[in-house]
A protein has these predicted regions:
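A glycine-rich helix N-cap at a beta->alpha junction
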Residues: 99-116
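Anion (oxyanion) recognition and catalysis
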Residues: 3, 75, 101, 180-184
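Cofactor-binding loop segments of dinucleotide-utilizing enzymes, especially the Rossmann-like FAD-
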Residues: 8-10, 86-89, 112, 125-127, ...
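Hydrophobic beta-strand scaffold residues
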Residues: 81, 107, 189-190
Length: 210
């Protein structure tokens, strides 16, 4: 199996709302920085989603996550892609896997004994197209070294790591191991920095990946 890109990342279902400028004030009241990604708990996210539904109606749902978006784009341009991630056996997880197959992305989905749902990213898009994201990682945060497909990494031209993985200790350790395997086998490594607040908050962890 020869691949162009092998990647690991947070598998998140995108829940997207188009908001108006007035909602920016409500975000400020909730201490959610406009234009950035903030990690929140499940109950907080559900409460905010219900608030948005009341004001803007039903959201758009789609397969998301930083690495996923990059792989879908690469696949649509003809690259052979492979993805390692974690979702639950819930409706969101099933829809996620179906979307990857639709986009011709080979994948190894890992199951977890943890009673956690598939992760979700609440995306609020303002009139000027700026995105504010509130993410609940769910089961994706349990991605670990045992989930890696060493063969897929070795047989790829590139290993792509999304910077958001540094927010989970087990995912960070998996990223470090994957990079070591890649470098040992002459596979080029690409790392996204994801967001300014991720770099500021996890500077040492990101340096550890370089």
């Amino acid at each position: 199996m020869e691949l162009d890109i092998c990647s690991l990342g947070n598998a998140l279902l995108d829940v997207q709302f188009s908001i108006d400028d007035n909602f920016k004030d409500q975000l400020k009241e909730l201490s959610i920085p406009f234009g950035l990604m903030t990690l929140i708990e499940r109950q907080e996210q559900e409460k905010l989603i219900n608030k948005l539904k009341a004001q803007y109606g039903e959201p758009l749902l789609d397969c998301g996550g930083s690495a996923t978006n990059s792989l879908i784009a690469a696949s649509n341009f003809g690259s052979t892609c492979y993805y390692t991630f974690k979702v639950s056996n819930d409706n969101a997880g099933k829809a996620y896997k179906e979307n990857l197959l639709f986009n011709n992305i080979r994948h190894e989905v890992q199951t977890s004994k943890l009673n956690l749902p598939t992760g979700q990213c609440l995306v609020m898009v303002s009139p000027d197209a700026e995105r504010t994201m509130c993410t609940y990682l769910g089961v994706s945060s349990s991605l670990n070294c045992e989930d890696l497909d060493n063969s897929a990494i070795k047989n790829s031209k590139y290993l792509f790591i999304e910077g958001y993985l540094v927010t989970s200790q087990s995912a960070l350790e998996a990223s470090i191991k994957a990079i070591k395997i890649a470098k040992k086998n002459g596979v080029k490594v690409a790392l996204s920095l994801s967001a300014a607040n991720i770099v500021n908050s996890f500077r040492n962890e990101i340096r550890g990946l370089i």
